[in-house]
Amino acid sequence: SNKVHPMLMTRGVPGTHDVKIMLDFFKKSKSKNFKSIKLPSFNKAVDDRSLKKSWYNIKEQPDVIIFEGWCVGARAEINKTLKKPINSLERTKDQKLIWRKYVNEQLRTKYKKLYSQLNCLIYLKAKNFSLLQKWRLKQEHKLWLNTKNKSSHKIMSKGDVINFMQTYQRITQNMFKFAPKYSTIILNLNSNHQIKTIKYNK
């Protein structure tokens, strides 16, 4: 965030993940000479990785790996579509398109290499972006209820969540449009997180 753009202080968008450690995990998990792997866990309440003593220790070679994340499989946009801001955050905080171009370039390069590790792509598609915001607010409220020492944790307010979600909006809406065309399986969800329909692409 200091070198590129302050908006990269907010985790989640391409360019804020440790792609190297993920690629290393895939490489080691596929190795014929498999050895145990230490895998980080994430603590949302403190908005950072858990201490190493809480990391997962994978002792046996996995048969199946489910690689989950909100932007898994996302693809880069064409540069000209980046010019028009889609929300107030882009309009006020990224007037020179530095953040948008950086995130898009990450998708085009490092994340393309990462997603090439996948054998198939299962896309869970919500009805719209406002529904995703509603679900995220509910998730944060549950986190607040389940956290004992609230003063020492980074639990977000409603306004924080809305701002946080704006950093995700561009890629999410791009996936709404294009991911159903290239995903292996598309699970269309209703407003209660239930699978409404399933589509298979050959």
Regions found by a protein language model. Give the residues of each.
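Conserved nucleotide-sensing/catalytic segment adjacent to the nucleotide-binding pocket
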Residues: 1-47
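Generic hydrophobic alpha-helical membrane-segment signal
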Residues: 6, 56-57, 107
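Acidic-enriched, low-complexity/disordered segments with a strong bias for Aspartate over Glutamate
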Residues: 18, 24, 47-48, 63, ...
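Phosphate-binding/switch loop-helix module in NTP-utilizing enzymes
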Residues: 27-74
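Conserved NTP phosphate-binding and transfer environment spanning the P-loop NTPase/kinase superfamily
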Residues: 64, 71-202
